[in-house]
Amino acid sequence: MTILSAITSISRPNKISKSVVSSNGGASLSLSSNSVACITACGGSSYSYSSSYQSSGSGFSYNSSYSSSVGYSSSVGIATGSCHSLCH
């Protein structure tokens, strides 16, 4: 059974986190201390994607990651915090 959910979390006017996850197994969403969205999706042909953008004064930080159970994974991050997602 496919689970499709879209979650939008706004913690501050200058920080917006938006996440979308689709999985035919199970999915879990967790927020780290700096409100960066972490998504883990487990199951056959499932994937997970998370992204966040923060703007404060003259500085900014952006973090995004994508992973798939079919063997492809990629991550790019420039952020002050860290986010870890694991499938068991």
From Swiss-Prot:
Membrane-crossing segments per the record: none
Protein name per the record: HssA/B-like protein 61
Coiled coil regions, renumbered to chain: none
A Pfam match: Coiled
Cited InterPro entries: HssA/B-like_chaperone, HssA/B-related
Gene Ontology biological process: sorocarp development
Organism: Dictyostelium discoideum (Social amoeba)
Protein family according to the UniProt entry: Belongs to the hssA/B family.
